[in-house]
């Protein structure tokens, strides 16, 4: 090989590696989802104190949980693919944690991003389906569209309308007692989430 092209190839390889190193956060982020999780760990953004409406039609805000952890996830009630898996695993986490932690230290919220269709009646059906107690695990939505968009953007939740539903990413989101998003968990690893929560929330 001509020396000129050899060194050019070497140079381009080094340049490409350097670019990948920079944009993948030191080779740690090779997908948007991984990058999102790393960003949360680095920044710990404050969660907007939006107003929720739960399955009983009652309004509440995250400020009510100040001093406690909150584990949240996002869904829409008519979802037929990923959401049932997410909620079943959410139930598995909830059922696996000590009652003392659930009573005093940690609350669960399943948040619908489809407030037009997910009325309190729909949310109540969802609550019964996944055996949420409606107290320590609430099923809710955010009626105000501006607040909902703000919340989704903060968490990096992508929601794309399609025929008869939405395409969206899914995960579990841990909010600390100061109202900061501090961890994003894989929804397919409920046992790991339980292990982590037992260590973190005491």
Can you say where each PLM-predicted feature lies in the sequence?
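N-terminal targeting signals for export/organelle localization
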Residues: 1-49
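Short active-site neighborhood of thiol/selenol oxidoreductases, capturing the structured segment around
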Residues: 60-90, 109
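Thiol-/selenol-based redox modules, centered on thioredoxin-like
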Residues: 158, 162-202
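Sec/Tat-exported extracytoplasmic proteins
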Residues: 69, 94-101, 130, 152-159, ...
């Amino acid at each position: 090989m001509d020396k000129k092209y050899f060194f050019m190839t070497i140079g381009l390889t080094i340049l490409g590696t350097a670019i990948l190193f920079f944009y993948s956060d030191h080779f740690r982020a090779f997908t948007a989802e991984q990058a999102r999780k790393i960003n949360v760990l680095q920044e710990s953004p404050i969660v907007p104190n939006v107003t929720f409406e739960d399955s009983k039609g009652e309004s509440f805000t995250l400020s009510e949980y100040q001093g406690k952890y909150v584990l949240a996830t996002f869904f829409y009630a008519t979802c037929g693919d990923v959401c049932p898996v997410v909620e079943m695993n959410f139930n598995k986490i909830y059922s696996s944690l000590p009652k003392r932690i659930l009573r005093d230290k940690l609350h669960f919220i399943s948040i619908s991003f489809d407030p037009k269709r997910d009325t309190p009646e729909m949310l109540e059906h969802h609550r019964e389906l996944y055996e949420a107690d409606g107290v320590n695990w609430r099923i809710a939505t955010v009626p105000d569209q501006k607040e909902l968009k703000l919340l989704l953007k903060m968490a990096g939740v992508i929601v794309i309308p399609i025929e008869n539903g939405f395409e969206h990413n899914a995960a579990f989101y841990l909010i600390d007692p100061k109202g900061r998003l501090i961890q994003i968990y894989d929804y397919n690893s409920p046992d790991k989430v339980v292990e982590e929560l037992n260590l973190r929330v005491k």
